[in-house]
C-alpha cells in the first residue's frame, strides 16, 4: 500500500477513535491485522501529540484557568473562593488519577504479549456494555467529594483503558458518572486527565524513537499528524454533543457490529 494512503488512514483512525469511545488502540490493531498497516514509534509519537493538542485547544480556557489558580496557590495569593477550591480539587484529582493510571499502565504493559486479537474483540463488547450502562442509568454513588477514592477508581479505570479494545474515554466517563459526577464534569475529567498521561507516555517512548525503523518520511509523518488533528477536532465535538444528548448507545451498536463483522470475516 502506498505510504501516503497509509498515513492518511492511520491519521484518520487515530483522530476519530482517540476521542470517540470506540478504542483507538483496538482499531489500530484491526488495521494491522486486515490491512497489514503497522504503527512505527516515530509515527505513534506524532499522532498522539496531534490528538493531545486537540484536547489542549478544546479546553484551552479551562486549562488556563486551572494553571492560574495553581500558580496563585503556590504564590499564596489565592483568595480561596468556592470556585478556587473546586479548581484545586480538580487539579488534585487529575494528579491522583495520573499516578494510579501510571501504576496500572506499567503493570499492563508487562503483559502486552497477551493482547490477542480475540481479547480485543472481547474488550469491544465490554466497552459497548459500559456505554450502554451510561445511557440507561447506572446506579450512582455519591463519592465525588472523596477526592482520593475518586482519583483511585478513575485512575485504575484509565489504566485498564490502555488495553486494546477498551475505550479510555468510555471507561473513565463511566467511572466518573458512577461516582456521582455530572456528564459535563465527567467529560472534563476524562479529557483533562488524558493530557499528562499522553505526555508521560511520549516521554517514555522518546528513547525508542531512535531504535525504530523510519518507514515514513517527514512529509508523510506530518501529513498523518495533520489528519489526526483535523479529525480529532471533529470527533471531540461530536462526542461532547452525543454525550450531552444521551446517545452513546450508538457507539455500543457500532462496536457490537464491528465484532460481528470481524467474527464473520475471520
Curated annotation (Swiss-Prot):
<dbReference type="InterPro" id="IPR003824">
    <property type="entry name" value="UppP"/>
</dbReference>
<keyword id="KW-0573">Peptidoglycan synthesis</keyword>
<protein>
    <recommendedName>
        <fullName>Undecaprenyl-diphosphatase</fullName>
        <ecNumber>3.6.1.27</ecNumber>
    </recommendedName>
</protein>
<keyword id="KW-0961">Cell wall biogenesis/degradation</keyword>
<feature type="transmembrane region" description="Helical">
    <location>
        <begin position="186"/>
        <end position="206"/>
    </location>
</feature>
<dbReference type="GO" id="GO:0046677">
    <property type="term" value="P:response to antibiotic"/>
</dbReference>
<keyword id="KW-0378">Hydrolase</keyword>
<dbReference type="GO" id="GO:0005886">
    <property type="term" value="C:plasma membrane"/>
</dbReference>
<dbReference type="Pfam" id="PF02673">
    <property type="entry name" value="BacA"/>
</dbReference>
<dbReference type="GO" id="GO:0071555">
    <property type="term" value="P:cell wall organization"/>
</dbReference>
<feature type="transmembrane region" description="Helical">
    <location>
        <begin position="246"/>
        <end position="266"/>
    </location>
</feature>
<keyword id="KW-0133">Cell shape</keyword>
<comment type="function">
    <text>Catalyzes the dephosphorylation of undecaprenyl diphosphate (UPP). Confers resistance to bacitracin.</text>
</comment>
<dbReference type="GO" id="GO:0050380">
    <property type="term" value="F:undecaprenyl-diphosphatase activity"/>
</dbReference>
<comment type="similarity">
    <text>Belongs to the UppP family.</text>
</comment>
<feature type="transmembrane region" description="Helical">
    <location>
        <begin position="114"/>
        <end position="134"/>
    </location>
</feature>
<keyword id="KW-0472">Membrane</keyword>
<feature type="transmembrane region" description="Helical">
    <location>
        <begin position="214"/>
        <end position="234"/>
    </location>
</feature>
<dbReference type="GO" id="GO:0009252">
    <property type="term" value="P:peptidoglycan biosynthetic process"/>
</dbReference>
<keyword id="KW-1003">Cell membrane</keyword>
<keyword id="KW-1133">Transmembrane helix</keyword>
<feature type="transmembrane region" description="Helical">
    <location>
        <begin position="88"/>
        <end position="108"/>
    </location>
</feature>
<keyword id="KW-0812">Transmembrane</keyword>
<dbReference type="GO" id="GO:0008360">
    <property type="term" value="P:regulation of cell shape"/>
</dbReference>
<feature type="transmembrane region" description="Helical">
    <location>
        <begin position="147"/>
        <end position="167"/>
    </location>
</feature>
<keyword id="KW-0046">Antibiotic resistance</keyword>
<feature type="transmembrane region" description="Helical">
    <location>
        <begin position="39"/>
        <end position="59"/>
    </location>
</feature>
<feature type="transmembrane region" description="Helical">
    <location>
        <begin position="4"/>
        <end position="24"/>
    </location>
</feature>
<keyword id="KW-0997">Cell inner membrane</keyword>
